[in-house]
Regions:
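Double-stranded beta-helix
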Residues: 29, 153-171, 198-251
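Short acidic-glycine-tyrosine-enriched beta hairpin
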Residues: 157-191
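His/acidic/aromatic-lined binding-pocket segments of jelly-roll/cupin-type domains
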Residues: 114-116, 134-138, 145, 178-179, ...
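A short, N-terminal "cap"/entry segment at the start of jelly-roll beta-barrel domains
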Residues: 12, 16-112, 239-246
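Glycine- and acidic-residue-biased ligand/ion/polar-headgroup-sensing regions
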Residues: 120, 133-134, 138-154
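Conserved metal-binding segment of the jelly-roll/cupin
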Residues: 179-201, 208-213
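A short beta-loop-beta micro-motif enriched in histidine and acidic residues
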Residues: 104-112, 124-135, 139-140
Length: 251
């Protein structure tokens, strides 16, 4: 597992990987996105998880608000989703809301928090982060299944044992080992640790929290197999609420 990272090497890894990574396009209809956001709000309510009031703003309420809302826009807070370019959100996709985040170029905040919804057997593909360390927390609902590999020197899947901590308890797994997080359990994922996750079949959708160092989804996701990330959107109806990728078009 990586323990230190050379800044210059990281910079070129970001550039090279993202040029390749962005070749795969995710495309989703706005009507599908609206439906997913509405159903997510209903699930958050059932789980008694409260979002900030601005999560429910209509698109027109954002007009001309950049100066007062730059902490939201610049730090990419808000609604976010992807089908990773597979055009089958229920099989391979993720919807989330970034509640707080820093921006190394614009503020001093060194941490981030997300809340995510993971459906039964809905996969977030195998990936690691060069820079970010994170805790993934099962906040309630079903069980979260996580598959783990160390990365090797060439950023492939290593066959070495995987050492992780779950709620402060050290555990050692075989390469490709699986952990199941029940509600209340969490895992710490260090930089360079490959992971994929999905909701366990038959247990219901999962409310998943993430607490981490500053999050940058434009340059700090190293997927084992290249995927799409921010979807191109077919505007078949008006947005109910904006995605983080919509801000530049509305503010």
């Amino acid at each position: 597992m990586h323990s230190t990272f050379n800044i210059i090497k990281l910079h070129y890894q970001y550039l090279f990987y993202n040029l390749y990574y962005r070749k795969i396009s995710a495309v989703m209809k706005r009507s599908e996105i609206n439906h997913l956001i509405i159903s997510s709000i209903e699930f958050f309510d059932r789980m008694n998880f409260k979002l900030p009031p601005w999560a429910f703003r209509k698109p027109e309420e954002w007009k001309g608000q950049y100066e007062t809302c730059r902490g939201i826009v610049d730090n990419m807070l808000g609604w976010d989703l992807t089908d990773f370019g597979f055009n089958d959100f229920q099989k391979c996709g993720l919807i989330l809301f970034t509640i707080r985040n820093g921006n190394p170029d614009k503020d001093k905040k060194p941490y981030a928090e997300k809340i995510m919804i993971v459906e039964e057997m809905q996969e977030t593909p195998m990936h690691f982060h060069w820079s970010k360390m994170e805790d993934i927390i099962n906040r309630g609902g079903g069980n979260l299944v996580i598959e783990l590999y160390n990365s090797d020197e060439k950023e492939g899947l290593s066959d070495t044992p995987v050492a992780v901590t779950t709620d402060g308890i050290l555990r050692t797994l075989i390469s490709g080992g699986i952990l199941v997080l029940t509600p209340g359990e969490s895992i710490c994922l260090e930089q360079g640790l490959y992971h994929r996750f999905y909701g366990e079949r038959g247990k219901g959708k999962v409310l998943v929290g993430e607490v981490s160092a500053v999050n940058d989804d434009t340059s700090d996701n190293r997927f084992y197999k290249p995927v799409g990330r921010f979807p191109a959107i077919i505007e078949d109806e008006k947005p109910v609420h904006l995605l983080v990728s919509d801000y530049s078009s509305y503010l």
